Amino acid sequence: MPANTDPVGTEKVLADGYVWVKIADHSKAKKNDNWKQKQRLIWEQLHGPLPDNVKVIFLDGNNRNFDPDNLAPVTNREHLEMNRNGFRTSDPELTKAGINVARLMVRTWL
């Protein structure tokens, strides 16, 4: 393995501010096939794979709090509505309510 290659299992904080974990070492793969956001990896280990249009958010807004109870899956569209309408807070219960409102918005405004 070249000296500048990270081994599988390496964790890095990338420019987006999130922790990414190297999950594979395929030399011809796209970058996203070798790396996965840690919160998504944890969610998928507990609940199974998520579709590509779903991301995992931190209910308390702290992107270093990987407690499974602090993680929630949302679709890209739900995430957009949450950000547009300020439905993300540092209070996990309010963020859960925001997710539900965003889901209603997505389902009724399509």
Locate predicted features.
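Secondary-structure boundary/linker elements at domain or insertion junctions
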Residues: 1-29, 78-105, 109
